[in-house]
Design a protein with these regions (language model features):
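Terminal amphipathic alpha-helical/low-complexity segments used for targeting or macromolecular assembly
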Residues: 1, 64, 70-143
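Single conserved hydrophobic/aromatic residue that forms the stacking wall/gate
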Residues: 1-10
Length: 143
């Protein structure tokens, strides 16, 4: 299925019971899709992201982001998942700060990306978030 270009599932994802993926979905490393999560066709789910139970994902989800609801809304950073993967507390705090820049300050995507890029030297994992944002077409709750 995946070798024919119908979608991409990378490694080490957790797909809980009754998670449904439509065609051409891409799921990044260490993403967790909780029970009864629905993912619309052509959506991309970023690395280390998390969906709450019963979430309906109709747009792309950036790396590290926790989404919940129907339709899905970005809620916070997947801090618990990051701790389990060995991320340091300081790095998780900086990713939270990056999330707030992206989702809570009312900035356009271009301005938010500029601010995030200034944080990469101190917190290299923010580059993963930036890269995922640049690859996504339609994503959650950002101007």
């Amino acid at each position: 299925l995946w070798s024919r270009g119908l979608g991409d599932v990378y490694k080490r994802q957790i797909l809980v019971n009754n998670t449904a993926l439509a065609g051409h979905v891409e799921i990044g490393d260490w993403a967790i899709l909780s029970g009864y999560t629905l993912v619309h066709q052509f959506c991309k789910i970023g690395a280390h992201s998390f969906s709450g139970m019963g979430t309906s994902i109709g747009k792309d989800v950036p790396a590290f982001v926790t989404v919940a609801g129907s339709p899905a809304e970005a809620k916070t950073i997947n801090a618990e998942g990051l701790r389990r993967r060995g991320f340091e507390s300081a790095e998780i705090s900086e990713l939270r700060r990056a999330f707030k820049i992206l989702y809570r300050q009312g900035l356009t995507l271009d301005v938010a990306l500029e601010r995030l890029e200034s944080m990469v030297a101190e917190t290299p994992s923010i580059q993963i978030l930036i890269d995922s944002l640049k690859q996504l077409k339609l994503f959650l709750n950002v101007k």
